[in-house]
Amino acid sequence: MYKRQAIPGHNLPLGALGVFILWFCWFGFNCGSTTAATYNLGDIAMTTNLAAAAATLVTLIVTWVRYGKPDISMTMNGALAGLVAITASCDVVNDYEALFIGAVAGVVVVFAVEFFDKVVKIDDPVGAISVHGVCGALGTLFTGIFGEGCSFITQMIGFVAAVSYTHLRAHETRHDLV
């Protein structure tokens, strides 16, 4: 047996550039998803930016406290976690709720990455499960809690349906490969 050892990213500036490009393009994604240029495009852009900024700052602080130094790579994942978490509710929450959603995503992504790496032992070098799966689910559920005109029960049904469908398809695929 060999000892597992992470291979650290070799070019943080290039990784940061990628995150900033994604952050910039997320405005088009969230604003464009409304399918109509209405009065609330500015609000959508603002909630998108606030959630990402809050997640970035909170992830930086959490990693600094937890590891004794800021983890820039994890902080970049925090920015993406905030963007993913706000996507479902960007048009139905206010600025303070967007800050809260981003801040929670910033904390959750750190512990989710550790959980999948150390407990579940899944090789996820970029933290995609934590960023997109966990923080996406979190954002979906927060839409039901904070979203104007949204129901938590409806969001929970959608979440359970998506997880169930994914589990069934993955189980079928696994048997097809054997």
Stretches found by the model and what they are:
Residues 31-39, 150-154:
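Membrane-interface helix termini and inter-helical loops of multi-pass transporters
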Residues 19, 23-27, 31, 51-64, ...:
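Transmembrane alpha-helical segments of multi-pass membrane transport proteins and ion-pumping complexes
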Residues 9-13, 70-79, 127:
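Cytoplasmic-side transmembrane-helix entry/capping segments in multi-pass membrane proteins
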Residues 6-11, 37-47:
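Interfacial loop-to-helix junctions that mark the boundaries of transmembrane helices
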